[in-house]
Amino acid sequence: MNVMEESLQKHKEWKGKIEVCSRAKVNNAKDLTLAYTPGVAQPCLEIQKDPDLSYELTRRANLVAVITDGSAVLGLGNIGGLAGMPVMEGKCALFKEFADVDAFPLCIKSNDVDEIVNTIAMISDSFGGINLEDIAAPRCFEIEAKLKEKVDIPVFHDDQHGTAIVVGAALMNACKVANKKISDITLVINGAGAAGCAIGKLLLFLGIGNLIMVDREGIICEGDNYLNEAHAEMAKVTNKNKLHGSLADALKGADAFVGVSKPKLVTAEMVKSMNDKPILFAMANPTPEIMPDEAKAAGAFIVGTGRSDFPNQINNVIAFPGIFKGALAVRASDINEEMKMAAAKAIAGCVPEDKLNAEFILPNSFDRSVPVAVAEAVAKAARETGVARI
């Protein structure tokens, strides 16, 4: 039985990966009058007078909505919201297991931006935060931006920002090991979708020396007439030397590569053309842009992938549980760039200096100290930037 067959069998046994459990014991008539009618009327009236009391009198303060339209589920494409439910349930289970954050899956049967935004906005008062998941680009950018204007709780598209945060953490530590300064390096991102653009923005915020983005048409350069709005925005702040050409052209002399694209796009010759001690994060799943052994044989100094069977797994699970735990703890109204940067630095800091090496640049996914450290850093950054409400 392979892993796919075993997973299907487990899902049949589980009949869902999450369930609702009562925090209120209802064992007798008195319990019933307190948890439900008539006693429940009093907290309702208190919330009516002061909506912020919803954080104290309900579970809202620890509840995240995990929402998809099913348009970009894993590598499966647009399979629809319902078919994406197993992924959303899995995400909710990870929130609970790693950060004790309650999460609820919501799969929306629509690909219309305004319909999705309005649906989420209308139910947002039930939650303390919104995690958007597996929504295709470029629609995901518009949905997130419009939602941020409509609701006063954090909205976080994990495929963008969770990935970017972990890549940022990995790059910080990789540069330490390779004795490179982030402000001096040239980094190439292959794949200018949701994750690629978010990674680029965070690395620019981090102070990267030169960032070059590549999509299926080649190197993105300001003035290219085929660029969509998101790409045009990135073109203004990347590719300092106005390079044109292919991925191979972009990688010549580059210090680092981040792949969020397709399998086997990077060759040994491309790696050999890079600067000394090249850093490669080949994150296409399940087959990376270049396999680690091939990259190492070609001279790669540090290699990371999205897979757990190779060193340096770049996995969002070390980011999103702690990020939301920290944001919820201070009732943040947003998860801003400073909070994302704080999360990345906290993750990087979870690898002890004396253990940091080319095959250990990120903490283990099961290191339970990571979400705690991330939550503390995120909450602190929220207070410092004025988005914390307690």
Regions found by a protein language model. Name each.
Residues D158-D159, A178, A282-I390:
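Adenosine-phosphate binding glycine-rich loop
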Residues N131-D134, A256-F310:
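ADP-ribose/adenylate-binding Rossmann-like module
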